[in-house]
From Swiss-Prot:
The gene is napA. Catalytic subunit of the periplasmic nitrate reductase complex NapAB. Receives electrons from NapB and catalyzes the reduction of nitrate to nitrite. One of its GO terms (cellular component) is membrane. NCBIfam families: NAPA, PRK13532.1. Belongs to the prokaryotic molybdopterin-containing oxidoreductase family. NasA/NapA/NarB subfamily. Predicted to be exported by the Tat system. The position of the signal peptide cleavage has not been experimentally proven. Its cofactor is [4Fe-4S] cluster; Mo-bis(molybdopterin guanine dinucleotide). It comes from Vibrio parahaemolyticus serotype O3:K6 (strain RIMD 2210633). This is Periplasmic nitrate reductase. Pfam families: Molybdop_Fe4S4, Molybdopterin, Molydop_binding. Its main location: periplasm.
């Protein structure tokens, strides 16, 4: 590649941006900018490996290794910018403890539950797995096997895994770690609109007059999108930024209005805003009358705990998602109790501030963008909160037009594209279909060439239930891919670790590194990372992006896709299907599950010649695997509002936002003129619902399952920091990021620290009924909790803070609440 003046300017711009951000570029990147080595580096595009923003990066490879990355200036998402994690993407694959071969617990030369991890071949690994799976299937049937996947799976990996589980093993016991982050958003979308994923797009950032962050610290969790809000705010003086949270963080630095509310009281605030809109005649009646219906949610629905838990037994309508049609007058009556006085009393937010927030929503001339992520979704009433925010936008008609957008942000690179769109949840199928719907199962069975009745109608075990079933010995063979749930999930000591170490169970973990989850497993499989394989992700604005494999894997690591497909070869159809199904499909007798799933004339229809020379998976299987899987998967959504472009197109663009119809992407869904599925003359068409109308759903404030008391007198909130991503599996192996933030700390109000005779930097014990951890106290810095609350990030494997979290979930979405549980803090003597 010749070093043109344009390339030189771009390269130096990257260096300048890094310097401004306080970043020292890796030596390889510095050489790229300063020396003739530039000519030896090959560049290609790929979406970033981290969050759900979907930034595109340019990846520089040399001698079979990634040596540099930089922001992609052609990308509409990030326009050449990266966050600090993105600047160091080149180092995530090269940690010193990268796993390079399968490791099986062995003793005296054979597998043993309490044995030491011993290197084995892939054949030994898969033979051992298959032996365990076959024994479990024969003894207990399909519900005894399960899989826990990821919003970091590529589209093809998630699709292959879901197909293997639901069509091959006939088990719906597959769930992604997106259950912990996006499940409440999914259910909220489905209840209100009958279809999943945001109606808006990132272009809304340049059009909104007011931004409202509901429990989201975008400055650290979505920093590139935060730059777009910052630019809009600083270049347009009329724009206002509102930040609601249970503690102060970096997003407050830009906020015109900051609101610190009591945990769980966001429900009361949202209902107050709806009441304010009604009482101040700010309802957009033309929109409401034409495009909405009013419904009432069942209340007192419990907390997703075990059935014998006293809180669950006390609930009047445990786990009920029933909606009852009501009139506007009934809806008005339901929100009337949420006066500003009542909302202020519950939330702790001053009345004047609440009114200021409500006015911005009520003003017909103010375009409002509401944004949220884990603060709203990781909530025992997360689905309700999603719907209460939609209510506000629907009452005012501020939806699906530029700058008017209720926008759920995602935390993982393909939580949308893989977990949600592919349907790797225990209850879902691709394109918003569900296993409980006979018509949906019939569609899937037709596309997958399955006999009727193959896919079980009952949803499988969701993430938290998988832990309980492992613990109880109901789920016995379990495969974890592309996540670190032993560190990320709740209530580790009581529910998760006992299930992993249950002698009846066989646990397999596929990961590039020896995580806490891997170390609790029986078999560890080394996994290819990011651009060591070809794949596709789908980001928060419905943008699907693809990339080519650009380097070989480290050691004998294999992609999750390769592992799923290769494992499926170990099973004859007679070993996984009953005779009644084989009688309906005699062509599968004597065939392997691999033959049925992947050599079906669809997945294997694209010849190897169409793939690039560097495509390990395709060369192993003898056909263009990624294209075949993608095109079969895309069949589900085309013509049904989830249209994807042909696979090859995605390699020529920086992503496209579905539905893609006649070669054109969709920016705003449901809006006539923008969405090809919106009927002519409709204005708005919420076509996910049969009547084309969105639901305004009434739901009240309800208290959390646990609150502080005299013994456990502080709230604990867990979350992330800018420099690390989730459990730190990748970022803690990047020296620059590790040095920047080497340890998790307990952010605490100075007065709470003083009351416990604790000084900044001293070690304390945080404890509750579920366990305890040791951590240093921080009373200054970026996160400043109010009195009565502490914040501890969960990236640090030495401080497994999430073991203190109760495994309470939203009863509708089954998503865990990581944002509030009572603890006590004592100084270490």
């Amino acid at each position: 590649m010749k070093m043109t003046r344009r390339a030189f300017v771009k390269a130096n711009a990257a260096a300048s941006a890094a310097a401004v951000a306080g970043i020292t570029l890796p030596a390889s990147a510095a050489n790229l900018i300063a020396s003739s080595d530039q000519t030896k580096i090959t560049w290609d595009k790929a979406p970033c490996r981290f969050c759900g923003t979907g930034c595109s990066v340019l990846v520089g490879t040399q001698n079979g290794k990634v040596v540099a990355t930089q922001g992609d200036p052609e990308a509409p998402v990030n326009k050449g910018l990266n966050c600090i994690k993105g600047y160091f993407l080149s180092k995530i694959m090269y940690g010193q403890d990268r796993l390079t071969q399968p490791l099986l617990r062995m003793k005296d030369g054979k597998y043993h539950k309490d044995g030491e991890f011993t290197p084995v071949s892939w054949d030994v690994a898969f033979d051992t797995m298959a032996e365990k799976w076959k024994a479990s299937l024969e003894k207990k049937g399909p519900t005894s096997v399960g899989m826990f996947g990821s919003g970091q799976w590529t589209v093809m990996e998630g699709y292959a895994a879901a197909k293997m589980m639901k069509a091959g093993f006939r088990s719906n016991n597959i769930d992604p770690n997106a259950r912990h982050c996006m499940a409440s958003a999914v259910v909220g979308f489905m209840r209100a609109f009958g279809i999943d994923e945001p109606m808006g797009c990132y272009d809304d950032f340049e059009n909104a007059d007011a931004f409202v962050l509901w429990g989201s610290n975008m400055a650290e969790m979505h920093p590139v999108l935060w730059t777009r809000i910052t630019d809009r705010r600083l270049s347009h003086p009329h724009v206002r930024v509102n930040v609601l949270s249970t503690y102060y963080h970096r997003s407050f630095e830009l906020a015109d209005h900051g609101y610190i509310f009591n945990p769980q009281s966001d429900l009361a605030i949202a209902n107050f805003i709806a009441n304010y809109i009604i009482e101040n005649d700010a309802v957009n009646w033309d929109f409401v009358n034409k495009h909405t219906n009013f419904t009432q949610a069942d209340t007192d629905i419990g907390y997703g705990l075990r059935d014998d838990d006293p809180l669950q037994k006390a609930a009047k309508n445990p786990n009920s998602g029933k909606l009852t049609s009501i009139s506007f007058e009934e809806y008005k009556k339901s929100v009337a109790p949420y006066t500003v006085e009542k909302a202020s009393e519950i939330s702790g937010v001053e009345k004047e501030k609440l009114i200021e927030l409500a006015k911005q929503y009520a003003d017909p001339n103010t375009k409002v963008m509401s944004l949220w992520t884990m603060g709203m979704n990781q909530h025992t009433r997360g689905v309700w909160m999603n719907n209460l925010v939609y209510n506000i936008h629907l009452l005012t008609g501020k939806i699906a037009t530029p700058g008017n957008s209720p926008f759920s942000l995602t935390g993982q690179p393909s939580a949308c594209g893989t977990a949600r769109e592919v349907g790797t949840f225990a209850h879902r199928l691709p394109a918003d279909m569900v296993v409980a719907n006979p018509k949906h199962r019939q569609i899937a069975e037709k596309i997958w060439k399955l006999p009727e009745g193959t896919i079980p109608p009952k949803p499988g075990f969701h993430a938290v239930l998988q832990d309980r079933m492992l613990n109880d010995g109901v789920l016995n063979c379990y495969w974890v891919q592309c996540n670190n749930n032993m560190q990320a999930g709740p209530n580790i000591n009581t529910e998760r670790l006992p299930g992993y170490r249950n002698p009846e169970n066989f646990i397999v973990v596929s990961d590039p590194y020896p995580t806490a989850t891997a170390q609790a497993a029986d078999l560890i499989l080394p996994t290819a990372m990011w651009i060591e394989k070809e794949g596709a992700y789908g980001n928060a604005e419905r943008r699907t992006q693809a990339w080519y494999q650009q380097v070989g894997t480290v050691g004998d690591a294999k992609s999750d896709l390769w592992q799923v497909m290769e494992f499926s070869k170990r099973f004859k159809m007679e070993e996984v299907w009953p005779e009644e199904l084989l009688a309906k499909a005699p062509q599968y007798r004597g065939k392997t599950m691999y033959d049925m799933l992947f050599k079906n004339g669809q997945v294997d229809k694209f010849p190897l010649e169409e793939a690039r020379e560097l495509n390990d998976d395709s060369h192993h299987f003898g056909f263009y695997v990624q294209k075949g899987l993608f095109e079969e998967y895309a069949t589900f959504g085309r013509g049904h509002g989830h249209d994807l472009a042909p696979y090859d197109v995605y390699h020529t663009v920086r992503g496209l936002r579905w539905p893609v119809v006649d070669g054109k992407e969709t920016q705003w869904r449901f809006k006539e003129g923008s969405d090809p599925y919106a009927k002519a003359g409709s204005g708005w068409d919420f076509y996910g619902n049969a009547d084309g109308k969105a639901k305004i759903i009434s739901a009240p404030y309800e208290a959390p399952p646990e609150v502080p008391d005299s013994e456990f007198d502080l709230w604990l909130c867990t979350g992330r920091v800018l420099e690390h991503w989730h459990t730190g599996t990748m970022t803690r192996r990047v020296p620059e990021l590790y040095k920047a933030v080497p340890d998790a700390v307990c952010y605490m109000h100075p007065e709470d620290a003083k009351a416990r005779n604790v000084r900044r930097g001293e070690e304390v014990v945080i404890a509750n009924k579920r366990g305890e951890v040791r951590v240093r106290v921080e009373t200054r810095g970026r996160n400043r909790p109010p009195k009565g609350l502490v914040f501890v990030p969960f990236f640090d494997a030495r401080i497994l803070i999430n073991k203190l979290i109760l495994d309470a979930t939203d009863p509708l979405s089954k998503q865990t609440d990581f944002k509030k549980c009572p603890v006590k803090i004592t100084k270490v003597a």
